[in-house]
């Protein structure tokens, strides 16, 4: 078993890692335990009561975080004609049609998110095996396939986050930087949970929000009492 470093041991000194904390306290502890020398990202891991191997229990979507992610998002826009100008004016970092697709085929992946107009999707599909595994494939469900390409680009640049449940029924979603502080991170957290709750599949049975934890990039996982999350949403 790998040994944890001094910073990690120092971070967990006064924390019970087996306990479930009220969400506001959990967020404060998460920020407090971040001891790395860089501005760590705070993530939430959600265990959902779904079985993603069934298509009617897949949870996939996107949410615009009120305070963004605290980092520059590089966006690739697959489009042509006037839409290229629209995408560039909205702030897309890389814009093109077949030329950009060819570039990706040759190994170019220097972007964090991708958008496309519907008329480009047949061509973009040819690089689906490259984009898909990296979470970069444009998708209508997340608003990244649209003729309103300017809006799609603007939302991503402003901190729109895409998410998709994994095979184990777990969602990992970034909430922003530790330097945001507990209050802003809690605002972003609320936006994420709101979006996830709205996407609850009708086929999902039993408890939907089964467990969750917060953590910084290098820090310990702080377990969250899901009942306190429900109260947060109601409040």
From Swiss-Prot:
Domain of life: Bacteria
Keyword Cell membrane: no
Pfam families: Ribosomal_L1
Quaternary structure and interacting proteins, as annotated: Part of the 50S ribosomal subunit.
Protein name according to UniProt: Large ribosomal subunit protein uL1
InterPro entries: Ribosom_uL1_bac-type, Ribosomal_uL1, Ribosomal_uL1-like, Ribosomal_uL1/biogenesis, Ribosomal_uL1_3-a/b-sand, Ribosomal_uL1_CS
GO BP, sorted A to Z: regulation of translation; translation
GO cellular component: large ribosomal subunit
Physiological role: Binds directly to 23S rRNA. The L1 stalk is quite mobile in the ribosome, and is involved in E site tRNA release. Protein L1 is also a translational repressor protein, it controls the translation of the L11 operon by binding to its mRNA.
Family that this chain belongs to: Belongs to the universal ribosomal protein uL1 family.
Single GO molecular function: tRNA binding
Keyword tags: Repressor, Ribonucleoprotein, Ribosomal protein, RNA-binding, rRNA-binding, Translation regulation, tRNA-binding
UniProt keyword annotation of Membrane present: no
């Amino acid at each position: 078993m790998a040994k944890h470093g001094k910073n990690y041991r120092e971070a967990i000194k006064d924390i019970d890692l087996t306990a479930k904390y009220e969400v506001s306290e959990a967020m404060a502890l998460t920020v407090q335990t971040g001891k790395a020398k860089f501005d760590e990202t705070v993530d939430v891991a959600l265990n959902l009561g779904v079985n993603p191997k069934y298509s009617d229990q897949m949870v996939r979507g996107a949410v615009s975080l009120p305070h963004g992610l605290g980092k520059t998002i590089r966006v690739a826009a697959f489009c042509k004609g006037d839409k290229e100008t629209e995408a560039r004016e909205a702030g897309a970092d890389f814009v093109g049609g077949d030329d950009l697709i060819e570039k990706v085929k040759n190994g170019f992946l220097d972007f964090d998110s991708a958008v496309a107009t519907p008329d480009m999707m047949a061509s973009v599909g040819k690089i689906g095996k490259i984009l898909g595994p990296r979470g970069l494939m444009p998708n209508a469900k997340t608003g990244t396939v649209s003729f309103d390409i300017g809006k799609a680009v603007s939302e991503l640049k402003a901190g729109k986050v895409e998410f998709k449940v994994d095979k184990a029924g777990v969602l990992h979603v970034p909430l922003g930087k530790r330097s945001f502080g507990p209050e802003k991170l809690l605002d972003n957290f609320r936006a994420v949970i709101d979006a996830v709750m709205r996407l609850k599949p009708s086929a999902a049975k039993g408890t939907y929000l089964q467990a969750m934890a917060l953590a910084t990039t290098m820090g310990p996982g702080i377990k969250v009492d899901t009942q306190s999350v429900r109260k947060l949403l109601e409040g």
